[in-house]
Amino acid sequence: MAQVAVSTLPVEDEESSESRMVVTFLMSALESMCKELAKSKAEVACIAVYETDVFVVGTERGRAFVNTRKDFQKDFVKYCVEEEEKAAEMHKMKSTAQANRMSVDAVEIETLRKTVEDYFCFCYGKALGKSTVVPVPYEKMLRDQSAVVVQGLPEGVAFKHPENYDLATLKWILENKAGISFIIKRPFLEPKKHLGGRVMVTDAERSMISPSGSCGPVKVKTEPSEDSGISLEMAAVTVKEESEDPDYYQYNIQAGPSETDDVDDKLPLSKSLQGSHHSSEGNEGTEMEVPAEDDDYPPPAKRPKSSEPPQPPVTEPANAGKRKVREFNFEKWNARITDLRKQVEELFERKYAQAIKAKGPVTIPYPLFQSHVEDLYVEGLPEGIPFRRPSTYGIPRLERILLAKERIRFVIKKHELLNSTREDLQLDKPASGVKEEWYARITKLRKMVDQLFCKKFAEALGSTEAKAVPYQKFEAHPNDLYVEGLPENIPFRSPSWYGIPRLEKIIQVGNRIKFVIKRPELLTHSTTEVTQPRTNTPVKEDWNVRITKLRKQVEEIFNLKFAQALGLTEAVKVPYPVFESNPEFLYVEGLPEGIPFRSPTWFGIPRLERIVRGSNKIKFVVKKPELVISYLPPGMASKINTKALQSPKRPRSPGSNSKVPEIEVTVEGPNNSNPQTSAVRTPTQTNGSNVPFKPRGREFSFEAWNAKITDLKQKVENLFNEKCGEALGLKQAVKVPFALFESFPEDFYVEGLPEGVPFRRPSTFGIPRLEKILRNKAKIKFIIKKPEMFETAIKESTSSSKSPPRKINSSPSVNTTASGVEDLNIIQVTIPDDDNERLSKVEKARQLREQVNDLFSRKFGEAIGMGFPVKVPYRKITINPGCVVVDGMPPGVSFKAPSYLEISSMRRILDSAEFIKFTVIRPFPGLVINNQLVDQNESEGPVIQESAEPTQLEVPATEEIKETDGNSQIKQEPDPTW
């Protein structure tokens, strides 16, 4: 095909126009042939020269390659011109020996220049992380010499285009080429604005490259503008700019043509041809990860925005749509950053091993390098990058470190530092990961600081034995109880508040620390006396005291109103589970709008206050007193006469529009004469306060619910027994010894349970979890590592079950009943004496959960600046990852609501209670920090009163459903993802 183009050169001037038409026609035919070859997966590149016109045809990749190599085109044009001149001269005169010798020298120097240029292209491509040659932007490098540095050139030889070197210099460079290398400090992105020589683009090429951009990214690069006089240099420069775009993607997982195609999508030709400097700068900021912007962990919402150029859309709808569709791929990003961190980690370990002359795997003591920067440091890191763990770097810094890996060197001036601490590091830092290493270190430092504080506190009291420091009292009375000698800008707090840097600073100045106690009597006051002075602080009143007082007040209101409904003069405790189980016969009217009837323990401060303000309107309606008689004290139950229950007009729904007739409740007086009659009227609901509660109550059937949950519990128990038998290699089911699984979780555990569902007795689960377990039964598997212990437990349980049963008295006083409970999700159950052991375990688990919940509440209150326990919004913390970070959790135990934690995990949490710390990284809506509400759009969010007490704090209402232990659930369990 090249011969066809060359054969068109020797033509006469009068035949120029006709020959041009012939050439155009033949080039179109050649283009068609290239398309057919492309269908057979053959790649073709063709350069044709006719007079001053240059034609580039071929397949897509062939054209792209030729257009990126300006030197190929120049060399071919130059070769054709020289050949034509040589042919003319050969016919006119004979070349002399000197001329022949000069010709040989010219060929030799041209060959050497070509060799040097190819080697420069290879080195430049290697610096970009590519295995192919990449054209060197000589003009840009000479204009901006700090962007790319060339090392290894012979002494006295400056870097420039090989055309400017003489024969001796070229030979010298080739002799020393092994030491030549390119170091890219800043990639080139801005396209050139100057046009070079004139190159004519014909209609054949226009038809070959569609302006619509539908032929793919490579075609867009060679698309001409409306001016047919676009130069050869401009076309080549445009392609070279695009080839340099992926400078920071050389470590990407994907490679090959798809990588360049993605980059080509980012730089449409219309911007480069128009010479738009600003648009190119916009692309530079959006398409590259600039090292200065080293966000270690870019959020997913940030990256997709950067993939869309900020300039107005160009006239290429196909490409524009393509760019908008591109979204952040977290999996690809995660795989990429993980791979880069692994490479940098291996690089650091290899360099560190070389520095200490060790063989085999080594562990770098990063804390030592940070605490002894003069004696232990690293040289050769890129400018602006400190030496840290690779897990703290982002992608740009990781790539820059890998580019400079040959220069990196560990400098160890004092080897004794490594030897003296190596044993401590191995003892205190588990090798299972960064998190365990950090946990061990901060735990040790906090314990040291706590011991230091206890010792100094005891010295201030005149004692020689260490005493526990009452940190809350120091915070409550900063003028009378304070600490001197702490490092600058470090307040006195519990050690659990401090991070590693502050803990180390406190230990360094431990000798200067002094506790000042001006009023020792404050340390002996009771809790109520201590909290009294705090009522004048901005918090105004302790939240825990306040909500407890309100709940007690609402409880008294409910008890009094319930007694009035029964015609009694004394307050009677309300059996809340019975009211929920029988909403048609037992309900409450007059509650504030939107507040259902529940135990006061379910309500937060805002709803409790609304109930207290509207207490005069509250009225209990009891249509079937016999339902509640068994829950009344014996003396009270005998005073209620239930004869009025036989009225035929009674069973009307409270929601009907007709009036509900009165029922008479006869109450015997003290002298058992003159009975009193109190009329209880149930008018139609008008304020809609119980609207959200009544429909749910009418739909709820306790009998159906009880039958369903009993059946599900039996199925799950049978499933567990079958899986337990399979684990022992038996065909029959084996009763599961749950106590053994709870006592030895390392040797006996269950795999395959649904996420968020712990292994417990089926009787402790609600309907949602039971159904999830049954749906997941194929994956459930029992792991029994000690069969002999298991068999012993089975035999003991079998022998105990065969013992003669004790005589059970039918009297209700013999059985242990769960009376006095208030929560809606607890029903009254009767537990035989034989199950006392199981009850004690359930009670123990419940106590552990309460202790862990109290611990989390106290720590969360400290984190938001309250200084008192605040209910932890577990669900909001779960659905807003990264907003609240919990430090100090034991290794292997993740932060969850206590109802989702195993007994062993809760015990470990309580053991590490002093080290657990909540940190609010990014507040979520509804969170109160230092009396400031983050977002008041929450329906039950915190309320700040402005009328009576402008500084009194409202804490979000605790309306969330809690799971309870034992056989004590009446309502459907909440979503276990909470």
From Swiss-Prot:
Family: Belongs to the TFII-I family.
Cytoplasm listed as a keyword: yes
Classification via PROSITE patterns: GTF2I
Molecular-function GO terms, alphabetical: DNA binding; DNA-binding transcription factor activity
Location of Phosphotyrosine modifications: 248, 377, 482
Annotated Polar residues bias: 669-690
GO CC, alphabetical: cytoplasm; nucleus
Modified-residue entries (N-acetylalanine), positions: 2
Annotated protein name in UniProt: General transcription factor II-I
Organism (species): Bos taurus
InterPro entries reported in the protein's UniProt record: GTF2I, GTF2I-like_rpt_sf, TF_II-I
Region (Disordered) location: 208-323, 641-660, 666-693, 795-816, 939-978
